[in-house]
Every structure is written in structure tokens, then in C-alpha cells.
Amino acid sequence: ASVTFWTLDNVDRTLVFTGNPGSAAIETITVGPAENTTVEFPGSWVGNWYAYPTDAEDVPGMLGEVQFGGWNGLTYFDVSAIVNPTDHDNVKQMWPAESRKPMSGCEVFPCDNAYWLPDDIQTKVTHEVDLWTTLGAGSTGLTF
């Protein structure tokens, strides 16, 4: 299982990972626009991540959330604004690497394709175990 992080602007960011109880710890990393960065996860990892500019204060923002190896071996994922809906500059979109469908999140926030309230029905599901996540302002040029 993996997530590839694609920085769309010129900002270096720190990525902080929080695993659910029983999930392995994933090291905090720094990513930037020079190249995409792929993080490997254990096959049944459940948790989330957020990003913040490396030269800024560590403030949790928009979350990328995932459950690898969930019910029937599926991957469940979403972009969540519940913790900090004012973060419009860090975690933006998530999608399965091969099919690129379904996509969660927004190229420009706010939109109706992310979790805003705890009872929103926004969790996406895929048979794939490799995902992409965009960071920062800009467009992938992909059509979802």
C-alpha cells in the first residue's frame, strides 16, 4: 500500500501521519515541488495525515484519511475538512493511482466532494492499494 504525494505549487511541506491504535507509526517527512514522494504503508494501516508549510507553525489542517485492507480487503479514503475547514492550501485531492476514480477532495476549496460534517457521506472506496494525494495550489491537469 502506498500514497504518492504530488506538490502542485512551490512550497516545501511537512507531512504528519497519525495511525489509529494498532497501526504502525509512519515517520513525519518533508516533501516539495522538485519530485513526487511515495510513502509505503503496511497493508492494513488505518489513519490520517495533514501537511503544513515547513517554514510555518505545525497546525493540523485538511486531512487525508485512509483505511488500507478494510472490509473485503478494500481501501477506503477521503479528504476531511472536519478538523480545520479553513486550510485550503495543503491536502487537496486523493484518488486511486491506476483508475483515478473515485476522487475525494477539491482542487479549490470549498467544494462538495470532501467531509465537512461528521455525518457527511463522502468516504470513497477502491480495490486499489496505491493512492495519490495532491498538496498546494494548482491543477493536476487530470480529469476526474
UniProtKB/Swiss-Prot annotation:
EC number(s) per entry: 3.1.11.-
Q: Which cofactors must be present for this protein to function?
A: Mg(2+)
Q: Which GO terms describe its molecular function?
A: DNA exonuclease activity; identical protein binding; protein homodimerization activity
Q: In its keyword annotation, does this UniProt entry include Glycoprotein?
A: yes
Location of the region described as IgE-binding epitope in the Swiss-Prot/TrEMBL record: 91-105
Q: Which compartments does it reside in? A: Secreted
* Glycosylated residues in this chain: N36
Print the keywords alphabetically: Allergen, Exonuclease, Glycoprotein, Hydrolase, Nuclease, Secreted
- Summary of temperature dependence: Optimum temperature is 45 degrees Celsius. Activity is about 80% of the maximum activity at 35 and 50 degrees Celsius.
Q: What is the effect of changing R100A?
A: Significant decrease in IgE-binding of the 91-V--P-102 and 94-M--G-105 peptides
Q: Quaternary form?
A: Homodimer.
What name does this protein carry?
Antigenic protein SchS21
